[in-house]
Structures are given as structure tokens and as C-alpha cells.
Curated annotation (Swiss-Prot):
Pfam families: Ribosomal_L27. PROSITE patterns: RIBOSOMAL_L27. NCBIfam families: L27. HAMAP family: Ribosomal_bL27 (MF_00539). Residues 1-20 are annotated as: Disordered. The keyword Secreted does not apply. Belongs to the bacterial ribosomal protein bL27 family. It comes from Chlorobaculum tepidum (strain ATCC 49652 / DSM 12025 / NBRC 103806 / TLS) (Chlorobium tepidum). GO terms for cellular component: ribonucleoprotein complex; ribosome. This is Large ribosomal subunit protein bL27. It comes from the Bacteria. GO terms for molecular function: structural constituent of ribosome. The lineage of its organism: Bacteria, Pseudomonadati, Chlorobiota, Chlorobiia, Chlorobiales. Keywords: Ribonucleoprotein, Ribosomal protein.
Amino acid sequence: MAHKKGGGSTKNGRDSNPKYLGVKAAGGSVVNAGTIILRQRGTAIKPGNNAGLGRDHTIFALVDGTVHFRNGRNNKKRVDIIPS
């Protein structure tokens, strides 16, 4: 006869890997063309002047310059790059 009960199983014990989303270059910081400014899911913040949108909704700089966040039309947030 066994002296211990069976170990059983659990439905817990796993976790997803971190996705490292968020702002990578704050407003006022100087960036080069191609620098990632923001990683996000969906387009909570849209690209403005001199900023591009990647296929995973990443916003990046198209020119060298300074990052500027602003509220666009209908209270939509936008990111501009002011050329230096």
C-alpha cells in the first residue's frame, strides 16, 4: 500500500513572456531616423509629421529631430518629429 497520496496536477504554472511595450523615446528627446519612439498594441497614439507606423503599430522616426507628443483632432494623441 502506498504511504503517500498521488501528486495530482495543477492548471497553473505558466506565464507569458514580457512584450516590452510603451514609450521608448520621451517627448523632447533627440532621435535619429529609424529610431523607435513607441511600441503599442493597436493605434492608441497615431503617427504625426515625420513619423511612420510599422505593421505591429510601432511608431518610428522618419527624419532626425526632436520627439513631440500632441493632442490631434478629436482628442487623438499624435507623435511628431520636429526636424533638427
